[in-house]
Each structure stands twice: as structure tokens, then as C-alpha cells.
A protein has these predicted regions:
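Alpha-helix initiation and N-capping motif
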Residues: 23, 27, 42-43, 155, ...
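Divalent metal-dependent catalytic cores for phosphoryl transfer on phosphate-bearing substrates
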Residues: 66, 76, 87-205
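Compositionally biased, low-complexity linear motifs
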Residues: 199-217
Length: 229
């Protein structure tokens, strides 16, 4: 007999494509990242925006297609970017760690309102008409006002990180990166997205063969060397 299931008792990652990292691992990493932010303003802003998103930040994909388009993809992408930024901050000590990490963690948080759900997601009316950059920027304004931080320089900087992270106006950013951390954020975002697209494409073909043309990678094909699994 067919009976409805209590969704709270079901692990959806058992049934759909999902992040290779468990939800518990991503949640643990998220808390560690927040604890690593020493600047009190950035930490309050990040925590406030995560409250806006709730569990959606952990559960949602980063896109309906293209990259990290699976259960948990948004948090996987954001955490991966933070980890790259942490390495870059060690190599380039002139970078503001707290700003760069906060920007990496929050840059796509508006996607939790831009998309309709964690599985078989579509773009919401708000998502289509406003986009995740505008949505996240609005949330940041609300959180900053609630915390009485709207006049802090850090708040202005985090606004800029969110607004400029697509790197170019023709890619959807209303402003170009004008802080060194914003330039790094744009480059790391692009790197992480492209490598995820390549990983997915290469994992689906046999060694010694080519991927189909990848639209998001300038319609190029990529070769999987023999001996690679």
C-alpha cells in the first residue's frame, strides 16, 4: 500500500544528485568559518544574513543548471570559495581576510530567494525580476539597519563585494570590482564555478574521449586523458 512519508524522516540525498560533502560536514565548516571572522561588524552582518536564508543556505543548489546545480550545491560552492580565499590570504597578506571571507560566504546567498526549492528548482518571480545580487543587497541593508551598522565602512565594503562579484556589468553586476578583495572574489567565483562544470562534464565520459561542447565555457570541448577515472 502506498502511504505518504514524513519528509523530516527522509534523507533526500539518498534519492537525488547532491553534494559530495554531507550536510553535517558543510554545517560544521560553515560554523568554523563564521568563528574565524574576527571583525565584529562582518560577523554580525554574516550571521544576520544567514538567519534570513535559514536552512535553505545549506540545502539549496547554486543554480538550476550550469554549476553546483544539485542538492547542497550553494553551500558547497560558497564554502569551497572561502577555503580558496583562506589560502590566498596566507599567500597575499595584504588582503583583508574578514572582508574576503565574508564576501565569499555571502555573495550568492540571495539565491535562496531567487530559486524555488532544493530539488527540481525553478526561478521564482522575485528571482526573475530582481536577481540574487539585488536580493542579497537588500537583505544586507535590512540586517545593517537592525544592527545599527548601516554607516560602518565595513557594511559599505560588503555591499560592494555582493554587487560586484560577477565582475562585469554585462554579466549582471551593477558595479565593477573596486576593492582588491572584490577583484579576488570575482576571480575565485569564476574559478570555482568553471572547475565544477568541468568536473561534472569529465566525470560523465570515458578516458580518452572528449566532452560535448560546453556552452558556459565558450562552447569548448575538453579532453579526458587516458588513465584518468
Amino acid at each position: 500500500r502506498i502511504q505518504p512519508l514524513d519528509q523530516s524522516t527522509v534523507n533526500m540525498s539518498d534519492f537525488v544528485i547532491s553534494s559530495a560533502q554531507s550536510e553535517e560536514e558543510r554545517s560544521r565548516k560553515l560554523h568554523e568559518i563564521i568563528d574565524s571572522i574576527q571583525n565584529e561588524v562582518y560577523r554580525k552582518l554574516v550571521k544576520g544574513m544567514l538567519i534570513h536564508a535559514g536552512r535553505k543556505f545549506i540545502e539549496y543548489p547554486a543554480a538550476s543548471q550550469i554549476h553546483h546545480n544539485y542538492l547542497g550545491g550553494l553551500s558547497e560552492h560558497s564554502i569551497s570559495m572561502v577555503e580558496v580565499c583562506q589560502m590566498l590570504c596566507k599567500h597575499y597578506p595584504q588582503l583583508d581576510y574578514d572582508l574576503l571571507v565574508s564576501g565569499a560566504l555571502m555573495h550568492d546567498i540571495g539565491k535562496t530567494a531567487e530559486m524555488s526549492g532544493a530539488i527540481a528548482t525553478e526561478y521564482t518571480l522575485e528571482g526573475k525580476l530582481e536577481g540574487h545580487i539585488s536580493i542579497a543587497n537588500g537583505w544586507l541593508t535590512e540586517v545593517a539597519a537592525k544592527e545599527h551598522l548601516e554607516d560602518c565602512e565595513e557594511t559599505i565594503f560588503l555591499h560592494h563585494m555582493i554587487l560586484s562579484h560577477h565582475g562585469k556589468m554585462e554579466f549582471g553586476s551593477p558595479v565593477l570590482p573596486k576593492l582588491q578583495e572584490a577583484e579576488v572574489l570575482y576571480l575565485v567565483d569564476n574559478l570555482d564555478a568553471r572547475l565544477n562544470m568541468l568536473s561534472q562534464a569529465l566525470s560523465s565520459i570515458k578516458p580518452g574521449t572528449w566532452t560535448p561542447k560546453l556552452f558556459a565555457l565558450e562552447n569548448r570541448q575538453f579532453y579526458k586523458p587516458k588513465g584518468k577515472e
